[in-house]
C-alpha cells in the first residue's frame, strides 16, 4: 500500500501527472497535455493500491468465513443471516432452514457493518482498477509508438462507470465503516447493548441496495447525463441514504440516552463529535443532491467545505481520535495523561472544522470555484475565516500529539516507525 501511494505521489510531484482528480475521459490519455511517463507510473501505483485493497478485503472475509473457525459460515449463510433475511422471510410465513442464528452464536453488528462496507470497497477497487488498466494500456501503446484512438471509449459511459465505483468509497469506507465503529465502541463505553440491534442489521442491508444506485449525484452538473438519471439516481435514490444514516445515528444516540447516567469520557466525547460531523456533512450533501440546487453549488467551494471536509475531518477524523483514546487505556492500562489537552484537542478540532467549512461554504455560495486560482481579493475574507478554522484544527491536533507522546513516551512512539535496533536500550515503559 505504501509503495502504491508513494508511486502515485511521486508521479504527480516529479512526473508532473496533472489530469484532474476525476480522471475524466479523455483527459488522462491526452498526452499533449498529460506527461506520458507520469501517467504510466501513476496508473501502476493506482493498480498496486487497488490490488492491495482487494487482498485486504479477501483477508477480512476469509477470516470471518474460515473453515478452521468452529463458528464457520458459508458465504451465503453469512449474507442471509447477517443482514436479517431469515427474519424478513418469517414475516411472509417462510422458514429459512439453513439460517445461522447470529443472535447468540454469530457475528456482532460491527462485523456485519465491516462486511457490508467491504462489499462496497471491493466494487470500488475493481472499478478503479479497470479504469486504471484502461489508461495504462493507452499509455503503453503511446510509449511504443502505436497510439490508440481515445474516441473508441464513450466518455459518458466511462464517467458513469468511474463514479459508480468511486462513490463506493463514500458509502463503504466512510459511512459503513464509521457506523460499524459506532456500533462497537458505544455499547462498550456506556455498558449497554446497542439499541435496535435487529433493526440495524436490516438497515445495513437496505443501505447496501441504496448505495448501488446513487452515483449520479456526482454527475448532476453534466448536461449530457440523461435527466431521468439525474433525477432518479442523483436525487431521489441518494436521498434514501439519509434515511439509513439517520436510523444509524438514531440507534447510536438512543443507546447513549438509555444508558444514562454516562460518564463523558474522551472517546465518548469524540464519538459525539463524529456524529455531529456526519449530521452537518450529510445535510449539506442533501442540498447538493438536488437537480436545481446543484446548478448553484456544483464544483464550488461548497462541495469540499461544508460537505466532504466536514464528513472526513470532523466525522471520520474525530472517530479515529475516539478509537485511539479508547484503545490506549484498554491495551496498555494507561490513562491518557492530560485531560485538558484532550479538551483542547476536542474543541480546537471541532470548532476549527466548523469555522473552516463555514468560510469555504460562504465563498462557494457566492460562486468561488474549487481547483481555481483567484488573483483578485473577492473571496479573500471568506478564505481568511477558513484559514482561522484550519489553524484552530492545527492547534487541536498538536495538543493530541503532545498528549499521546506524553502518555506513551517518546521512544515508544518512535518505535512504531523506526527499526528496534536503532532504539535498543532507549525504550522505557510508559508510566501508568
Model-predicted regions and their roles:
Residues 155-156:
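A cross-kingdom feature marking solvent-exposed beta-strand/loop segments within repeated
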Amino acid at each position: 500500500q505504501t509503495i502504491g501511494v508513494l508511486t502515485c505521489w511521486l508521479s504527480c510531484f516529479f512526473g508532473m501527472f496533472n489530469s484532474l482528480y476525476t480522471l475524466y475521459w479523455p483527459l488522462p490519455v491526452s498526452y499533449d497535455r498529460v506527461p506520458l511517463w507520469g501517467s504510466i507510473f501513476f496508473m501502476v501505483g493506482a493498480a498496486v493500491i487497488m490490488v492491495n485493497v482487494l487482498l485486504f478485503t479477501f483477508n477480512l472475509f476469509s477470516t470471518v468465513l474460515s473453515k478452521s473457525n468452529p463458528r464457520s459460515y458459508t458465504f451465503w449463510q453469512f449474507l442471509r443471516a447477517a443482514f436479517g433475511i431469515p427474519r424478513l422471510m418469517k414475516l411472509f410465513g417462510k422458514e429459512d432452514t439453513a439460517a445461522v442464528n447470529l443472535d447468540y452464536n454469530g457475528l456482532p453488528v460491527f462485523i456485519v457493518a465491516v462486511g457490508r462496507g467491504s462489499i462496497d470497497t471491493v466494487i470500488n477497487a475493481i472499478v478503479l482498477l479497470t479504469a486504471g488498466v484502461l489508461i495504462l494500456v493507452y499509455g503503453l501503446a503511446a510509449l511504443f509508438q502505436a497510439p490508440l484512438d481515445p474516441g473508441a471509449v464513450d466518455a459518458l459511459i466511462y464517467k458513469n462507470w468511474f463514479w459508480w465505483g468511486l462513490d463506493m468509497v463514500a458509502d463503504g469506507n466512510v459511512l459503513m465503516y464509521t457506523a460499524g465503529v459506532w456500533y462497537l465502541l458505544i455499547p462498550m463505553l456506556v455498558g449497554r447493548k446497542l439499541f435496535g440491534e435487529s433493526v440495524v442489521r436490516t438497515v445495513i442491508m437496505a443501505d447496501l441496495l441504496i448505495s448501488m444506485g446513487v452515483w449520479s449525484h456526482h454527475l448532476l452538473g453534466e448536461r449530457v447525463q440523461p435527466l431521468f438519471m439525474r433525477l432518479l439516481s442523483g436525487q431521489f435514490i441518494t436521498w434514501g441514504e439519509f434515511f439509513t444514516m439517520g436510523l444509524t445515528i438514531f440507534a447510536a444516540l438512543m443507546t447513549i440516552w438509555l444508558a444514562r447516567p454516562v460518564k463523558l469520557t474522551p472517546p465518548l466525547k469524540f464519538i459525539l463529535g463524529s456524529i455531529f460531523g456526519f449530521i452537518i456533512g450529510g445535510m449539506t450533501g442533501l442540498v447538493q443532491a438536488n437537480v436545481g440546487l446543484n446548478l448553484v453549488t456544483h464544483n464550488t467551494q461548497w462541495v469540499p467545505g461544508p460537505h466532504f471536509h466536514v464528513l472526513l475531518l470532523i466525522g471520520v477524523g474525530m472517530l479515529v481520535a475516539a478509537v485511539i483514546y479508547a484503545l490506549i487505556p484498554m491495551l496498555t492500562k494507561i490513562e491518557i495523561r492530560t485531560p485538558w489537552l484532550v479538551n483542547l484537542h476536542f474543541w480546537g478540532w471541532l470548532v476549527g472544522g466548523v469555522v473552516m467549512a463555514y468560510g469555504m461554504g460562504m465563498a462557494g455560495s457566492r460562486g468561488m470555484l474549487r481547483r481555481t486560482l483567484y488573483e483578485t481579493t473577492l473571496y479573500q475574507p471568506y478564505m481568511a475565516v477558513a484559514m482561522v478554522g484550519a489553524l484552530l484544527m492545527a492547534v487541536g491536533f498538536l495538543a493530541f500529539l503532545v498528549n499521546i507522546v506524553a502518555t506513551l513516551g517518546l521512544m515508544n512512539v518512535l518505535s512504531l516507525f523506526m527499526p528496534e535496533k536503532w532504539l535498543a536500550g532507549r525504550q522505557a515503559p510508559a508510566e501508568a
